[in-house]
Amino acid sequence: MADITDIKTILYTEKSLNLQEQGVVVIQTSPKMTKTGLKAVLKEYFGVTPKSINSLRMDGKVKRFRGRLGQRNDYKKFYVKLPEGVSLENAEA
């Protein structure tokens, strides 16, 4: 079962800030999180039932460090459309 510890952060990029005007929040999670798991976490911890959830899987970038190849962690990104007038005020919890 999904837990709130699987949510890494709420993304604040130029694109996500433009989407917030339309009631969409972008959330970065661990790769094992599912749409139903995220919906349950949002309902339990934030008291919000999302209208829709879209997800995409992001592969970690390959980077060089001191001449050696390394890879950043993989993650999932969720675009969560919230009902009209609802926000995640206690998102820092």
Curated annotation (Swiss-Prot):
Entry keywords, A to Z: Ribonucleoprotein, Ribosomal protein, RNA-binding, rRNA-binding
GO biological process: translation
Gene Ontology cellular-component terms listed: ribonucleoprotein complex; ribosome
Lineage: superkingdom: Bacteria
One Gene Ontology term of the molecular function aspect: rRNA binding
InterPro entries: Nucleotide-bd_a/b_plait_sf, Ribosomal_uL23-like, Ribosomal_uL23/eL15/eS24_sf
Subunit structure: Part of the 50S ribosomal subunit. Contacts protein L29, and trigger factor when it is bound to the ribosome.
Family designation: Belongs to the universal ribosomal protein uL23 family.
Role played: One of the early assembly proteins it binds 23S rRNA. One of the proteins that surrounds the polypeptide exit tunnel on the outside of the ribosome. Forms the main docking site for trigger factor binding to the ribosome.
Protein name as it appears in the record: Large ribosomal subunit protein uL23
Species: Campylobacter jejuni subsp. doylei (strain ATCC BAA-1458 / RM4099 / 269.97)
